[in-house]
Amino acid sequence: MYKAYFNLTRNPFELTPDPSFLFPTNRHNEALAALYYGVRRHKGFVVVTGEIGTGKTLLLRCLLRLLKQSPDVAYAYVFNGLLSPTEFLQYILADFGLAASGKNKGELLLELSNFLISRGSKKQTTVLVVDEAHHLSADILEEVRLLTNLETTEDKLLQVVLVGQPELDEKLDSVGLRQLKQRIALRARLDPLDGAETKGYIERRLQIAGSSQADALFSEQAIAAVHRHSRGFPRLINTICENALIAAYGRRLQRVTPGIIEDVAKEFRLDVIHEVETTGSHNGIVIPRATKGAPDVSSVLRRPVTRKQIWVRMRPFQ
């Protein structure tokens, strides 16, 4: 609707995760490097957590794009954690292209085991990627741990990537999952963007969408207002900016003003969300906290050869 008016070739603030729009902050680069390194080096478990709207699913899409470039990699992508253990196994097998219908749990495990052993004997990489992993029950998480028991003296046959909200960290801290937690090789955390990153994020998306003067569409004051109301969460930034462009188009303005941002924030009741946060309620978006546990991502990236290999593969996203 507003694309022609603002001389754009595509929607710059679509909510659908699109890897071509990835804004490579240091945190996102490190998280993507940790994911790719963990999978390609057969580290076993890799965990990434972050609040709602910090770009976790987009990060996974970028990882899957990288993995598709490698003919020796096969992955199953699970995005529904609200499954029974048997349904979870059926989903995994089906995504790997294996027969799953009508089989009981024992038969499913045998089929998957044979698949992993066969691929392992050929030095191939097999990956289980779980989005929204905070929804997984303790039973399923334990099932996943048991799947990783399949290993040779030299290698792990199944690589597992768990991505979810901070509740996943809390689950992994439970006594019943202590064995799984001990197997986590790499962890990364996605935090909201700071003010400078929010500005860069908005301008990059506008440039990718065809704007020749990205800084002309949103004033500095408007971008500051976007950051204040979104608190740096990319999903909220997209929502605010999308509706701000629609409002500017409707008013026949050539630039988004701070007043428009304030109107959008009121319409979406973002001030109410902020009030819930400041009162400490757990129903709103809480301020991210540091993750403790497995080795820090930065320590992994200090290895020269490995780091070079990873960043070469990641260039399309920078």
Sequence positions of predicted segments:
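Helix-loop-helix "sensor" segment of P-loop NTPases
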Residues: 98, 118-121, 161, 169-234, ...
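Walker A/P-loop nucleotide-binding motif
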Residues: 42-62
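Conserved catalytic segments around the Walker B and adjacent sensor/switch elements
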Residues: 46, 69-80
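Conserved NTP-binding/hydrolysis module of P-loop NTPases
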Residues: 11-13, 72-73, 83-102
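Pre-Walker A adenine-sensing motif
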Residues: 28-39
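Mid-core helix/loop region of P-loop NTP-binding domains shared across ATPases and GTPases
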Residues: 84-85, 100-143, 152-155, 194-198, ...
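Trafficking entry modules
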Residues: 2-3, 9-13, 256-318
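Dynamic helix-loop-helix/coil hinge segments at AAA+ ATPase domain boundaries and subdomain interfaces
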Residues: 3, 10-29, 98
